[in-house]
């Protein structure tokens, strides 16, 4: 069983004919992902990358049976694109776009919380279930099928963790890049919970960073849930100065609990196997699965 996306997912690309959408959609198709079409308003009826183009998400749902969407739409229009997908009945919405105004995301979050759908992102690398579906911008060749789930705020650290896990002789069930913005659809805790409840996932790598309380919330849930599966944790930003945004919009130390040190302490107190360097992730996974 996989989480969020699999070989049966029927995926559409919003912003399909733009340069980003075109490049990444073609990579997804080459990977073997079941892309059933795309959406670009005003270009409906055309064909692009051998797939149909629709004017609206609703049309893509009606005609192609789409149930999953990936969004490559400019920041000013991305919030509307997310809400359009949700309203059309798309079940899994993955938004890659970086730079969506926070005020827009407040509205999006309130809207999608009323509907039966899952938003991953924005400002994320996407989701991959190796050898089944790559719905994102990650380099697919790094990921091999296996039994370790990954939840990460960082795109590049997701790839690094996957590479190490694979080199240790294990593989990945599903990797979820949740994104680094202050307001995101799927939280660390929610993503970890999905993997905890996945039969094929035997261990989880959880990668966080400074800013916010998502990792602490996840760690407390992991303990309350009975530490059913081993979780390896890493927090990026251990040398970050307070009050300065570091890379991601959400990566800013506001209070004492936002620091990497404070988060690592909370993780360890709740039974997470914390590593101090990303270079140690693979070794720790091998240790907890031995």
Model-derived segments and their meaning:
Residues 1-290:
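Catalytic-core regions of core metabolic enzymes
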């Amino acid at each position: 069983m996989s989480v969020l996306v699999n070989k049966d997912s029927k995926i559409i690309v919003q912003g399909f004919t733009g340069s980003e959408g075109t490049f990444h959609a073609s990579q997804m198709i080459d990977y073997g992902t079941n892309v059933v079409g795309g959406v670009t308003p005003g270009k409906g009826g055309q064909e692009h990358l051998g797939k149909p183009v629709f004017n609206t998400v609703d049309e893509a749902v009606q005609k192609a049976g789409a149930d999953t969407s990936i969004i490559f739409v400019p920041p000013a229009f991305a919030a509307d694109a997310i809400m359009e997908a949700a309203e059309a009945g798309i079940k899994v919405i993955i938004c890659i776009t970086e730079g969506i105004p926070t005020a827009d995301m407040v509205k999006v979050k309130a809207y999608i919380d009323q509907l039966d759908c899952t938003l991953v992102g924005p400002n994320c690398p996407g989701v991959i279930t190796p050898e089944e579906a790559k719905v994102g911008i990650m380099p697919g060749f790094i990921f091999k099928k296996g039994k370790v789930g990954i939840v990460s705020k960082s795109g590049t650290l997701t790839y690094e963790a996957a590479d190490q896990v694979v080199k240790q002789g294990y593989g990945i069930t599903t990797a979820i890049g949740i994104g680094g913005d202050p307001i995101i659809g799927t939280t660390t805790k929610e993503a970890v919970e999905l993997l905890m409840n996945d039969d094929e996932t035997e261990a989880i790598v959880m990668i966080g960073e400074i800013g916010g309380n998502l990792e602490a919330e996840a760690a407390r849930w992991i303990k309350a849930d009975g530490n059913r599966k081993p979780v390896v944790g890493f927090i990026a930003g251990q040398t970050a100065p307070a009050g300065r945004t570091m890379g991601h919009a959400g990566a800013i130390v506001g209070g004492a609990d936002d620091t990497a040190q404070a988060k690592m302490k909370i993780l360890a107190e709740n039974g997470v196997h914390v590593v101090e360097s990303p270079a140690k992730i693979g070794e720790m996974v091998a240790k907890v699965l031995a």
